[in-house]
């Protein structure tokens, strides 16, 4: 599979607005959700459809198209992934929600799990993992492993900003997984933050420091 950087003018404009140092919590949340919707649109481009006949407004039969047999679970990585959830559900409202809680060790930059709750029948579902920042790739790799260990066979990743280091880690370990990203930035700093990045997305979404 591959990395898909969404080079749409609206996506690039919105990501640019998110980089402003003085952006408000309200605006950051709104833009996170809006970009998440656009990423979900791109990630669902290959969903199959099938014909169906319905009764139209005037009582006549109307042929329409509907999604065919695609069961989706959206998997936000706590806590920042919650900021993308509504945007994805706006596009795929029937999706089930699974949750993974991970915290990063600031010394090793690796993730440890403190919570997980998956929907049933993961082997029949496409999992869309959502997390605004793909930095070292530690949290993403841990989430992918948890999904695989619980039987999930189809996984895609949606994130706002990714560092080359994180992308390299995930694509090397999981070449079968598609990654949809709004922007690929320059690098990580010594603390594992993406540059130029967005800062701490969790703090900006939740209004904490």
Swiss-Prot record:
Its pathway, per UniProt, is: Pyrimidine metabolism; UMP biosynthesis via salvage pathway; UMP from uracil: step 1/1
Q: Provide the activity regulation entry from the record.
A: Allosterically activated by GTP.
User: Is Nucleotide-binding there in the keyword field?
Assistant: yes
Write the Enzyme Commission number(s) for this entry: 2.4.2.9
Q: Which residues bind 5-phospho-alpha-D-ribose 1-diphosphate?
A: 79, 104, 131-139, 200
Q: Name one GO biological process term.
A: uracil salvage
Read off the InterPro entries from this record: PRibTrfase_dom (IPR000836), PRTase-like (IPR029057), Upp_B (IPR034332), UPRTase/APRTase (IPR050054), Ura_phspho_trans (IPR005765)
For the keyword Cell division, the answer is no
Which top-level enzyme class is recorded in the Swiss-Prot or TrEMBL entry?
A: transferase
| Cofactor: record remark | Binds 1 Mg(2+) ion per subunit. The magnesium is bound as Mg-PRPP.
Q: Which family does it belong to?
A: Belongs to the UPRTase family.
Tell me the PANTHER family matching this sequence. Answer: ADENINE PHOSPHORIBOSYLTRANSFERASE, URACIL PHOSPHORIBOSYLTRANSFERASE, CHLOROPLASTIC
Q: Which HAMAP family match?
A: Upp_B
**Protein name (database record):** Uracil phosphoribosyltransferase
- The species this protein was found in: Geobacter sp. (strain M21)
> Which gene is transcribed and translated to give this protein?
upp
